[in-house]
Amino acid sequence: MCPPVSVRHGARGMSCLYEAWLYHLVHGEQTKICFACFKAAFLLNKLYLEMGDWQEEEEEEEEEDADLLEYLSESESESEQEPGPEQDAWRGLGSLYVPQSVSEGSGVLLPTPVWTQGILFSIFVPTELFPQEAVPLDLGPEDAEWTQALPWRLDGLFPCSHQLIPPLTWWDIFDVMPSPGQPVLLELRCHWPLDQTVAQSWLQDQKFVLLLDSVQSRCHLLSMRVRWVVRTQVQHWQVLLDPGEMWVAHFRKEVGQHGLYHQSLNPWRLSILTASELGMELLPATCYLWNKGFWVGSFLPWHINMPETWSWEPGERLFITDATICGTDYHLAQSFLDSHPTPHPLLTLTP
């Protein structure tokens, strides 16, 4: 399975290598390695490939394996002979140990062949993959460099002590309330069959918003851009939301068609901003996604398990009447609103 790399992510400022690192964190062997160390390992591997060491090392390994088999077969044929004192000294160290010198029947010590000097290291401390064990990493046609088509040998990645930002895997769960600037990882499950291509495209187009706090009719909103959407090996969806601009907004409530009311705005904590007949509306993401065929399994790092009541149809509707952008680019937020035209311009911005 290849990393989800495409021109779309590159247009948003995300490099193909960064996409591969994110994919490794989510779908790899749960190795905690920062992007800087991952990039250094990639560049070192790329340098080896460009130097042409790949084929040469494979040929050397094949020659060493053949010589080792020949040597072991000769040793078995001579096993009936009485071992000398020099052989007794190292016999208990294992059948793969090769001494610095061996004794023939005449008692003369002869040096071992040169090819035996690296046997212990290559057997007990493997540093490379065999060709059949390598996993190809295709970074996409837009980076059609000859080294990209060759198999990677990064199976031996080791964890680093650097901080991982963003926390993308299930073992990176926060025990305290995270800061608003951290990304969010959604795990979605389908409760009816969905077309994979259509579902991925639809999730990419959604405008997620975090409701950070609210006092009476005033609230703080944080827009969350969809970085990528991937289909996991267990047939779930993972959606990475990257924090964007901060808004100070005013909202109003409208009585809905259902009799079930929420005493708080918790169901709107993660919302999707949509255009409706009454203006810009905040829809609870759990309820809206449920109606589209998705069930939110987890909402990291905020919630490991989503409350069941958040998927219920709310008894009221929330509409944004005005919003002021805080500490970000005005034109960026304006483009966000331009993509959601409303019949009634209820949403105004103050640059």
UniProtKB/Swiss-Prot annotation:
One of its GO terms (biological process) is homologous chromosome pairing at meiosis. Residues 55-90 are annotated as: Disordered. Disruption phenotype: Mutant embryos exhibit intra-uterine growth retardation and have small placentas due to a reduction in the number of spongiotrophoblast, glycogen trophoblast and sinusoidal trophoblast giant cells. They show an incomplete penetrance of embryonic lethality preferentially affecting females. Knockout have heterogeneous spermatogenic defects and testicular degeneration leading to infertility in the most severe cases. During spermatogenesis, mutants show impaired recombination during leptotene stage of meiotic prophase leading to chromosome asynapsis. Knockout females are fertile. Keywords: Cytoplasm, Differentiation, Meiosis, RNA-binding, Spermatogenesis. One of its GO terms (molecular function) is piRNA binding. Residues 117-164 are annotated as: Important for interaction with piRNA. It comes from the Eukaryota. Induction: Expression is down-regulated by DAZL protein, which binds to 3'UTR of Tex19.1 mRNAs and probably represses its translation. Pfam families: TEX19. Expressed in testis, placenta and ovary. Expressed in pluripotent stem cells. In testis, expression is highest in mitotic spermatogonia, decreases as spermatocytes progress through meiosis, and is present at low levels in round spermatids (at protein level). Residues 55-85 have a biased composition (Acidic residues). Residues 1-73 are annotated as: Interaction with LIRE1. Transmembrane segments: none annotated. It is found in: Cytoplasm. One of its GO terms (cellular component) is nucleus. Required during spermatogenesis and placenta development, participating in the repression of retrotransposable elements and preventing their mobilization. With its paralog, Tex19.2, collaborates with the Piwi-interacting RNA (piRNA) pathway, which mediates the repression of transposable elements during meiosis by forming complexes composed of piRNAs and Piwi proteins. Interacts with Piwi proteins and directly binds piRNAs, a class of 24 to 30 nucleotide RNAs that are generated by a Dicer-independent mechanism and are primarily derived from transposons and other repeated sequence elements. Interacts with UBR2; does not lead to Tex19.1 degradation and stabilizes it. Interacts with piRNA-associated proteins DDX4, EDC4, MAEL, PIWIL1, PIWIL2, RANBP9 and TDRD6. Interacts with L1RE1. This is Testis-expressed protein 19.1. It comes from Mus musculus. The lineage of its organism: Eukaryota, Metazoa, Chordata, Craniata, Vertebrata. The gene is Tex19.1.
